[in-house]
Amino acid sequence: MKKIDITGIGIGPFNLGLAALLSHHPEIKSVFLERKPEFRWHEGLLLQGTTLQVPFFADLVTMANPCHHLGYINYLHQHDRLHQFYYYDSFLIPRREYDHYCRWASKQLPDCRFGENVSHVEYDAKLDKFIIESESASGEKQKYISQNLAIGIGTKPRIPKWLETCKHPLVKHSAEFAKIQEQLKQCKQVTVIGSGQSAAECVLALFNSLTPEQVKAGASIRWITRSAGFHPMEYSKLGQECFTPAYMQYFQSLPRDKRRDIAASQGLIYKGISFSTIGDIYDVLYERSVAGEKSGLSLYTSC
């Protein structure tokens, strides 16, 4: 049984960033466990032309430690891409490169253990510690006693109840879009449900591939949301202040009920669609509707 100061369950960007920062603090014993064999970030949405919605400064470590060796700038340097990035002239990096950057970092962190599935977690009141049991792909079992837990398992894809029992191979969550994108392009009608960034990117990819000839033959895309509209993400300079350490300290000082009310009203800080994606969709809509022609895309709100 191994005694640990902090155990991370799941290795996504948040726990990977924590592992990277802790690598400069050897006095803190840590381990991070992930059942997947290697780091992969939203592989079903690593679409050509997509970027992060936040500047590259929000990498794994820079905002906490700008001198850290696992920062994005050093990643570029190590891959001989620093000058190309300078000429790229954008704060928003390609999503595929962010995934590659995270995989590069994960391979330099021995405390990140991939292919190790956490099978049981319990709190021992007598020890005032957590007991974590895990098993590797080869069947090797481990047990850890940990003072702290960092849960980073991500969110479960949400499927509407009325679709949960549907077994059609092309009824999928957007997290699997890249796997079925080519098949969807051959469908006469496609419906996309949801009005977040992922849904918008699926719509844009399908819309760009829809030819005028297909539209004339009856092909179409329907974009449906229960929201009142297809809203942009809050990305104003004042809005971004919600992510500063000063605001977080203020937020944590508020009563629990107040924090819940505020959090419930801040959905568009992270749930909306980027201005650029909205603009790209509208531009295609405009061009496709010249001379009253059908664009091939219909939008439905409040459904």
Segments the model singles out, each with a brief description of its role:
Residues 1-41, 85-197, 201-303:
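Flavin (primarily FAD) cofactor-binding/catalytic cores of flavoenzymes
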